[in-house]
């Protein structure tokens, strides 16, 4: 009976050691996975910031260009000869979407 008890205790100790080693291995894997995910997120953020820098620098210039085109279109449309009058006139702030020039009432 003593031999069988010691075998059971030895088996139990080996099982507990194996369980502890498995738990530590799983913990290391989890830690590595979390570290890898954090590192990947940082690299992705750095790449996005690097790629967005030229766009952020160009945005004010693009907005200005867009505004100039819009103003130029309005000026061109509104300084055309008005069919209701025989002279050129600057427009009010009517959008140039109507069939008649915006300088006409």
Curated annotation (Swiss-Prot):
It is found in: Secreted. This is Putative neurotoxin 9. The keyword Secreted applies. The keyword Transmembrane helix does not apply. GO terms for molecular function: toxin activity. Belongs to the scolopendra neurotoxin 10 family. It comes from Scolopendra mutilans (Chinese red-headed centipede). GO terms for cellular component: extracellular region. Expressed by the venom gland. Contains 3 disulfide bonds. Residues 1-21 form the signal peptide. Keywords: Disulfide bond, Neurotoxin, Secreted, Signal, Toxin.
């Amino acid at each position: 009976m003593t031999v069988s008890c010691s075998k059971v205790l030895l088996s139990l100790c080996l099982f507990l050691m194996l369980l502890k080693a498995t738990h530590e291995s799983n913990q290391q894997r989890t830690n590595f996975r979390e570290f890898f995910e954090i590192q990947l997120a940082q690299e992705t953020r750095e790449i996005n910031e690097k790629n967005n820098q030229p766009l952020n620098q160009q945005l004010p210039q693009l907005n200005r260009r867009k505004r100039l085109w819009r103003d130029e279109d309005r000026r061109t449309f509104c300084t055309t000869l008005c069919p209701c009058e025989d002279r050129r006139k600057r427009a009010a702030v009517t959008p140039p979407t109507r069939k008649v020039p915006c300088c006409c009432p």
